[in-house]
């Protein structure tokens, strides 16, 4: 985010850089974003290929992302930990992606996709919350 003025103090979770003209930029450095989500989408692609269905990745992403909009706001209770690698913003040295749910959660494709989309921007939100306070 290009800043109108310098931050009031230094934040461990925010990297400061500048634009070519020297304007200050605050950047949340996330190690994990869509890598885990992309892995799941590639799994759906592989399934389509096994069925002999032509794969257009733009269509696969579009259909799955739009379908996520029909899921529950709370993702039906499903939880995704998308850490392929460590994440300094949240204090994790190593990554171990996981998808978890309880027997009573609303396990649907829409909720599955929604929770992975939320997870892909979760760390970015933590950093942005610092900037917008």
Give a label for each model feature.
Residues 1-133:
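Active-site core segments that coordinate phosphate-bearing ligands/cofactors
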């Amino acid at each position: 985010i290009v800043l109108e003025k310098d931050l009031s103090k230094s934040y461990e979770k925010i990297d400061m850089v500048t634009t070519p003209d020297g304007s200050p930029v605050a950047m949340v450095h996330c190690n994990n974003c869509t890598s885990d989500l992309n892995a799941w989408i590639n799994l759906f692609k592989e399934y389509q290929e096994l069925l002999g269905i032509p794969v257009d990745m733009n269509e696969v992403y579009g259909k799955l992302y739009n379908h996520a909009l029909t899921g529950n706001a709370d993702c039906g209770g499903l939880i995704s930990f998308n850490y392929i690698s460590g994440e300094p913003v949240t204090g994790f040295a190593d990554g171990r992606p996981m998808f978890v749910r309880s027997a009573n959660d609303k396990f649907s494709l829409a909720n599955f996709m929604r929770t992975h989309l939320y997870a892909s921007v979760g760390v970015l939100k933590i950093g942005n919350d610092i900037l917008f306070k």
